A protein has these predicted regions:
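Glycosyltransferase catalytic domains, chiefly GT-A lineage
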Residues: 1-197
Length: 197
């Protein structure tokens, strides 16, 4: 149903007129929201930024279930949403962001820094590892303050990672693995931050 689909589009100075020309092809309600982020080290932080502003302007959606996902996916079939309306947050399974993945980088400072930014303890992550997920979310009641913290934590985590990257590489190399083989999926920052908040 077109009225149930809300597409959030960010813009900096003004909306490109081409968007208006092509709105008739869009299968949903388009909301143009100005990108007023003060920090943009982590470009995907635009997502929580747009969502927090949308929720502030549309508080009626706090009592609605929302299916949030990126625009670059295609569904063969939609999930059975009715079976998911149980007050919990549902996520797609994404083992590439679970606790074991982070620990596999052999960097005690890395995991400590990541959890400290969000304010969660490692024991909670380990206990809930089987529930790790992201990329697509089904939730209710996550408003402005939640998404504002997610936006701020994304920027802190991403920037903090690069500020201490050499330390993480040193710890990785100290475990006997070639320092040049170090890699870490920091692009998933927002997935950790949403999950851990």
């Amino acid at each position: 149903n077109k009225e149930d689909i809300h597409i959030l589009v960010g813009y900096k100075q003004e909306v490109n007129p081409i968007w208006y020309q092509n709105l008739h092809t869009v299968h949903g309600i388009v909301h143009f929201i100005q990108d007023e982020r003060l920090t943009t080290h982590y470009l995907p932080s635009i997502r929580p930024h747009l969502i927090k502003k949308f929720m502030m302007r549309n508080p009626q959606f706090l009592s609605e279930y929302i299916f949030y996902h990126d625009a670059d996916i295609l569904f063969g079939n939609l999930p059975l949403f009715e079976g998911m309306e149980d007050g919990r947050v549902h996520v797609s399974r994404t083992p590439y962001i679970d606790y074991s993945y982070i620990i596999s980088k052999n960097s005690p400072s890395l995991i400590k820094d990541l959890v400290d930014i969000v304010g969660i303890d490692q024991e909670t992550l380990l206990k809930n590892e089987a529930n790790t997920g992201g990329a697509q979310y089904f939730f209710k009641g996550l408003g402005y303050s939640f998404w504002d913290k997610v936006e701020r934590d994304c920027e802190k985590m991403f920037r903090g990672y690069f500020d201490k990257l050499e330390t993480y590489k040193d710890e990785f190399a100290a475990s006997g693995i070639d320092r040049t083989k170090y890699d870490f999926q920091i692009w998933t920052t927002d997935m950790w931050v949403v999950l851990w908040n």
